Each structure stands twice: as C-alpha cells, then as structure tokens.
Amino acid sequence: MASKAFELQMMGYGLTTAEIHYHMPDHPGLLQLYVWQEYDLAPKFPTLKGFLDFWAKELDGVLHSVRVAHNRLISPREWRVVNGVFTLQ
C-alpha cells in the first residue's frame, strides 16, 4: 500500500510550506514565526486556508502575515517513455 503522501501527490497535491508571522499574545509588539508544512492544492490552498481559519478562531496570537511556497514534487515533466531493454551482464 502506498503512503498517504504519495497518494496525495498522484492526485495533484504539492508540498506547501507557509511561514506564518503572528503577534505574541503576551507581547503584541513582538512577532513570532511558525512554519507550517502540508500537502495542498494550488492555487486555492484549501488545507492552508482551513488551518488559518482554525488559527484565527481558536488561538490567541493575531496573524500578521503569511508567506507561501508550493512545489509539486511529482509532475508530468519528470516522466518520459524509454524504448528498449537493458541487460546487465
């Protein structure tokens, strides 16, 4: 059985990394960084949006900014047809 990560990649998901800057609850003048990483679908990022909605509703640290990077680890350009049989002797 394939891993969940591999199955998601085969369905078009890519690895998404978000740098989330937020104000510390006890010291609102200070920013803290949280790095979040999960497989998600670009460009709408439903998983990331769900996490940020949870953050805004349930956590005390007010969001300041979010920077997102996304990369599909498996994509069509990595596949090519090879004709022939190779024998090792």
Curated annotation (Swiss-Prot):
Query: Which UniProt keyword terms apply here?
Result: Amino-acid biosynthesis, Aromatic amino acid biosynthesis, Tryptophan biosynthesis
Query: What processes does the entry annotate via GO biological process terms?
Result: L-tryptophan biosynthetic process
Q: In which pathway does it act?
A: Amino-acid biosynthesis; L-tryptophan biosynthesis
Q: Where would one find coiled-coil regions in this protein? A: none
Give the InterPro entries listed for this entry: Usg
The UniProt function text for this chain reads: Probably necessary for the cotranslation of trpF. It may also function as a subunit or stabilizer of phosphoribosylanthranilate isomerase (trpF).
Name of the protein:
Protein usg
The organism of origin for this protein: Caulobacter vibrioides (strain ATCC 19089 / CIP 103742 / CB 15)
Q: Which gene encodes it?
A: usg
